[in-house]
């Protein structure tokens, strides 16, 4: 029972870290990467479809993304979707290929992005702590039902606290790396 609670807690904490990494990947730095456009959708015959399902997204160079549309009639829609996204990108259409240059980040924009990342990091820390709280509540329930002793509960709580510390430290490390990446010119 205790091991199940620990395994569930660790699994949920790991998923929180993965979600945080995914969120960090969306935050634009000065460099281009193909995953930057993954969350942008385009109207494809009446349904919202991610860009990577209607085109090849590749890197042309460190500061330019190339989008090779599979159907010529989709080029204008894809270009508009990229332009209208919240990323502040200005795509240029060249037939079937759309070039998306990455504008240099201003100091002010870097600070704003750092604040956004800091907020996301705090949300991830809170999520990890909520998993700890839920696991500790499950342990208290087992103790109330006399399924475990107080010593077992205390040991399990200590183990869960160690897991929490480990995953909060991981969030802090990821945040520090992203902050350094954002502030690098």
From Swiss-Prot:
Cited Pfam families: RRF (PF01765)
Entry's localization field: Cytoplasm
GO CC terms, sorted: cytosol
Record has Membrane as a keyword: no
Domain of life, per lineage: Bacteria
GO BP annotations listed: cytoplasmic translational termination
Keyword terms of this UniProt record: Cytoplasm, Protein biosynthesis
Key word Hydrolase present: no
Gene3D superfamilies according to UniProt: 3.30.1360.40, Ribosome-recycling factor
Molecular function GO terms recorded: ribosomal large subunit binding
Functional note: Responsible for the release of ribosomes from messenger RNA at the termination of protein biosynthesis. May increase the efficiency of translation by recycling ribosomes from one round of translation to another.
Similarity-based family: Belongs to the RRF family.
NCBIfam families recorded: frr
Protein name (database record): Ribosome-recycling factor
Organism whose genome encodes this protein: Laribacter hongkongensis (strain HLHK9)
């Amino acid at each position: 029972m205790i091991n199940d609670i620990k395994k569930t807690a660790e699994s949920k904490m790991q998923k929180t870290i993965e979600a945080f990494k995914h969120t960090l990947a969306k935050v634009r730095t000065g460099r281009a990467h193909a995953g930057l456009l993954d969350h942008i959708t385009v109207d494809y015959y009446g349904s919202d479809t991610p860009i990577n399902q209607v085109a090849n997204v590749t890197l042309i160079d460190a500061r330019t993304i190339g989008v090779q549309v599979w159907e010529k009639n989709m080029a204008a829609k894809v270009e508009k979707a990229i332009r209208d996204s919240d990323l502040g990108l200005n795509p240029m259409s060249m037939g079937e290929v759309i070039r998306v240059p990455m504008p240099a980040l201003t100091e002010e924009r870097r600070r704003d992005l750092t604040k956004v990342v800091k907020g996301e990091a705090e949300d991830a820390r809170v999520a990890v702590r909520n998993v700890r709280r839920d696991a500790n509540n499950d342990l208290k329930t087992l103790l109330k039902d006399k399924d475990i002793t107080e010593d077992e509960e205390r040991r399990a709580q200590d183990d869960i606290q160690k897991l929490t510390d480990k995953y909060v430290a991981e969030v802090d490390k990821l945040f520090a790396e992203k902050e350094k990446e954002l502030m690098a010119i």
